[in-house]
């Protein structure tokens, strides 16, 4: 049987991405469709989450599915030493699809290989976050009217930021120019720069973050420095406040510029930016509902024709 899991966005073709965005668009028109009546969605969060977990659960509820799962692994048998394989096999007895976030890179891939039901990767360590990428792509498409030939500036934690890794891979189909803005300690890992070269993705690296650097951006994708990924807290203290976006920095930017952030923010976007028409991060989070409805339907075999 075909495995319909969503482990990485790299497995999606250009056509598949555009198809998924069209599904999300239909759900934005009407999110209350009982397409998953009688289905059970399990949300297994081995790492903290607010937006991802709640938007997946809301997506499932609005589609008529029931939701089971946990948001704190300490309250489960994994705290007693149960293996990931056993947890996945056990939950597969109860659910039609498993949405999983895990602190280990590769955990979602492993789960998809042992589970008899589809796995949706809701983040695996610093590796991938494909459902976030789907809502990011939808947000970019909605605000720019296209995914083609855009200048996309990725700012902050590019080393541990799984959202920027996934976005980079997804955009390979659309001829972007990336600008990687990060301190030395958090720059884009070599493997992703090699990926860019292999797929003819243009990129420029910066360590400065100022008005001049960002003036040609179509998308400014801010990220927080992730304290939980650091083994050396002194290193975290050195870089945590390195880039802060302030409203005055936007004065000479393009009129079509939109600021995205996977959230939560800490202090990398000043609150005075919230009032700018270029700030889009809260609407971006709302788009997560529609993108995740599309993902749940797709992995469960529901097509665009079923919802038109």
From Swiss-Prot:
Pathway: Pyrimidine metabolism; UMP biosynthesis via de novo pathway; (S)-dihydroorotate from bicarbonate: step 2/3. InterPro entries: Asp/Orn_carbamoyltranf_P-bd, Asp/Orn_carbamoylTrfase, Asp/Orn_carbamoylTrfase_sf, Asp_carbamoyltransf, Asp_carbamoyltransf_Asp/Orn-bd. It holds the Pfam family OTCace_N. Keywords: Pyrimidine biosynthesis, Transferase. Its EC number is 2.1.3.2. L-aspartate binds at residues 80, 162, 224. The keyword Hydrolase does not apply. GO terms for molecular function: amino acid binding; aspartate carbamoyltransferase activity. GO terms for cellular component: cytosol. One of its GO terms (biological process) is 'de novo' pyrimidine nucleobase biosynthetic process. It comes from the Bacteria. Carbamoyl phosphate binds at residues 51-52, 101, 129, 132, 263-264. Belongs to the aspartate/ornithine carbamoyltransferase superfamily. ATCase family. Heterododecamer (2C3:3R2) of six catalytic PyrB chains organized as two trimers (C3), and six regulatory PyrI chains organized as three dimers (R2). This is Aspartate carbamoyltransferase catalytic subunit. The gene is pyrB.
């Amino acid at each position: 049987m075909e495995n319909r899991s969503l482990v990485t966005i790299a497995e999606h073709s250009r056509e598949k991405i555009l198809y998924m965005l069209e599904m999300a668009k239909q759900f934005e028109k009407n999110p209350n469709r009982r397409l998953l009546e009688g289905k059970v969605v399990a949300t297994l969060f081995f790492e903290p989450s607010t937006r991802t977990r709640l938007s997946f659960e809301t997506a499932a509820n609005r589609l008529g599915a029931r939701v089971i799962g946990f948001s704190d692994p300490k309250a489960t048998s994994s705290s007693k030493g149960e293996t990931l394989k056993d947890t996945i096999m056990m939950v597969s007895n109860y659910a039609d699809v498993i949405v999983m976030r895990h602190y280990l890179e590769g955990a979602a891939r492993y789960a998809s290989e042992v589970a008899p039901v589809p796995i949706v990767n809701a983040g695996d360590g610093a590796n991938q976050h494909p459902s976030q990428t789907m809502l990011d792509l939808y947000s970019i498409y909605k605000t720019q009217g296209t995914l083609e030939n855009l200048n996309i500036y990725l700012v902050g934690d590019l080393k541990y930021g799984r959202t920027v890794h996934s976005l980079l891979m997804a955009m390979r189909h659309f001829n972007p120019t990336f600008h990687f803005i990060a301190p030395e300690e958090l720059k884009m890992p070599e493997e992703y720069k090699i990926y860019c070269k292999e797929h003819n993705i243009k990129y420029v690296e910066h360590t400065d973050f100022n008005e001049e650097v960002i003036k040609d951006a179509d998308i400014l994708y801010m990220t927080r420095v992730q304290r939980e990924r650091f083994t050396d807290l002194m290193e975290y203290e050195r870089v945590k406040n390195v880039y802060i976006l302030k409203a005055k920095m936007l004065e000479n930017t393009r009129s079509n510029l939109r600021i995205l952030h996977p959230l939560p923010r800490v202090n990398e976007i000043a609150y005075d930016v919230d009032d700018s028409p270029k700030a889009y991060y809260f609407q971006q989070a709302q788009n997560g509902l529609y993108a995740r409805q599309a993902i749940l339907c797709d992995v469960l075999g529901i097509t665009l024709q079923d919802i038109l």
